[in-house]
Amino acid sequence: MQARWRFTDRSYGDLAIGSAGDLEQRRRSIVDAPWTWLEQVHGAAVVVVGSAGEHAGTRADAAVTDQPGAALAVQVADCVPLVLVGTSPSGAAAVGVVHAGWRGLGDGVVEATVAALRRLGATGVAAHIGPHIRRRCYEFGAAELDSVVCAVDPAVRSRTAWGTPALDLTAGLHHVLAAARVTTADDAGTCTACSPAHYSHRARADTGRQAAVAWLEQG
């Protein structure tokens, strides 16, 4: 099988749950298959999807599948949209999506998703990192920053472009991925706070959301 994924931006429309207009049509314009979307709660729960559309609306922050035609999605504005591709000697074995904010990163959502992919038969895992807020724009309270440092790694401690304490989500994610023996295949490199093409709750109080969508195809 082959893994496919897409990181959307404003040009795909608002993909927030409950957004105005025909959300289903916007989804199907991206991938014409039933979506498993999640009621995200900034936790570490992972759902295993056995058929297209299964577990849609479940309270979780990650999903994995080894079934072709099942589209998995997470919605974000500044948190990290992460696609994980589980590989085997014969190709893609499974795929997963993760909503990785600072709480989920500290609670182990990435590690839980990697473990779920390995239970589905993945012998290797590669990460594809989507657009998210970067350290130069992510001002963070000192006490909360200390808690993330303790939960993740000192590498998350940084400074904004204007010199105040900041959280480096990217550095934290790279640390977690390396510890989980995951290869980082690529990083979009885009900061949602800086990019007018993306929604950002922090920078512009946007209520809209972009998405990471991943699925498997036969072939």
What are these regions (language model features)?
Residues 1-219:
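Active-site microenvironment for binding and transforming phosphate-containing groups
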